[in-house]
UniProtKB/Swiss-Prot annotation:
Transmembrane portions of the chain: none
Name by which UniProt lists this protein: Nucleotide-binding protein Ccel_2290
Annotated GTP binding sites: D59, I60, R61, G62
MF (Gene Ontology): ATP binding; GTP binding
Role summary: Displays ATPase and GTPase activities.
Annotated organism of origin: Ruminiclostridium cellulolyticum (strain ATCC 35319 / DSM 5812 / JCM 6584 / H10)
InterPro entries with a match to the protein in the record: P-loop_NTPase (IPR027417), RapZ-like (IPR005337), RapZ-like_N (IPR053930), RapZ_C (IPR053931)
Annotated residues for binding of ATP: G8, M9, S10, G11, A12, G13, K14, S15
Disulfide bonds: none
NCBIfam families: PRK05416.1 (NF003828)
Pfam families xref list: PapZ_C, RapZ-like_N
């Protein structure tokens, strides 16, 4: 049985995450009093496989009840069940903006002092955050990216090694993704855009893929990138980095970067990393621009 506690800052996306967990088969319960968690775990374990994946949403609305959380989880552990904690985070200014847009009242700001309430909540949740298995900062994530993060951690068949790796292909014509930690420019690789049969294809098509990946420049680049990532990823994990965003760019983001990003994704998956792929500009019309 997989038993997950979902918690974090109000406004950081717990409702969305709950929906995404339900989409991948989790039975979700919102704001269960911590004192009831051990009994709930016991009942879930006796459900004869009907409740194999459980997510409990615990937040500041529980007030003083939050103090009961870790004693309850310790009891769960003593009963032979393991658990994971997912903590959702966001910057203060982002949370303020979200609250103002939604016109909701923060649970710790009854008199409307929103920023003060957010800071009080952050302080109250610090201990829980320090014990979290996974921390996702949603400050700059769009909903699709948040779903990718959740799938990367919780989809069956993937092993979480302490870091989520996002690989994104893009076109320099449309700008470099602002959230990338590593950016690789693959415009030095022979360009299939200028070969008539491949001009209107993408790096997803077999002809383009073979052309790009069979180039001697690509083979050498992939080999060196492989070694670089094998070195970097364990060191990022050691330093506590929980997310790595890798951008691979060509001119228009439809040919070379797509084929190479897919190959990088495939190799990382083979090494059992939690990895997601995005082709940001593959659908964009880049007439007259080499890809």
């Amino acid at each position: 049985m997989r038993f997950v506690i979902v918690t974090g800052m109000s406004g950081a996306g717990k409702s969305l995450v709950t929906k995404y967990l339900e989409d991948i088969g989790f039975f979700c319960v919102d704001n269960l009093p911590p004192a009831l968690i051990p009994k709930f775990a016991e009942i879930s374990a006796q459900s004869e496989g009907k409740m194999e994946k459980i997510a409990l949403v615990i937040d500041i609305r529980g007030g003083e009840l939050l103090h009961d959380l870790f004693p309850a989880l310790e009891e769960v552990k003593k009963s032979g069940f393991s658990y994971e904690i997912l903590f959702l985070e966001a910057d203060d200014d982002v949370l303020v903006k979200r609250y103002k847009e939604s016109r909701r009242q923060h649970p710790l700001a009854p008199e409307g002092r929103l920023l003060l309430g957010i800071r009080e909540e952050r302080k109250a949740l610090q201990t829980i955050k320090s014990k979290a298995n996974y921390i996702i900062d949603t400050s700059t994530l769009v909903t699709r990216q948040l779903k990718q993060e959740i799938n990367g951690i919780f989809l069956e068949g993937k092993i979480f090694k302490g870091i989520i790796i996002n690989v994104v292909s893009f076109g320099f014509k449309y700008g470099i993704p602002t959230d990338c930690d590593l950016v690789f420019d693959v415009r030095f690789i022979p360009n299939p855009y200028y070969i008539a049969p491949m001009k209107n294809q993408t790096g997803k098509d077999q002809m383009v893929k073979e052309f790009v990946l069979n180039a001697s420049e690509t083979k050498e680049f992939i080999s060196k990138l492989d070694g670089m990532l094998d070195f970097l990823i364990p060191n990022y994990i050691k330093e506590g980095k929980s997310q790595l965003d890798i951008g691979i760019g060509c001119t228009g983001g439809r040919h070379r970067s797509v084929a190479i990003a897919d190959e990088v994704y495939r190799r990382l998956e083979e090494k059992m990393h939690s990895v997601v792929i995005e082709h940001r500009d593959i659908e964009k019309d880049g007439k007259g621009v080499g890809k």
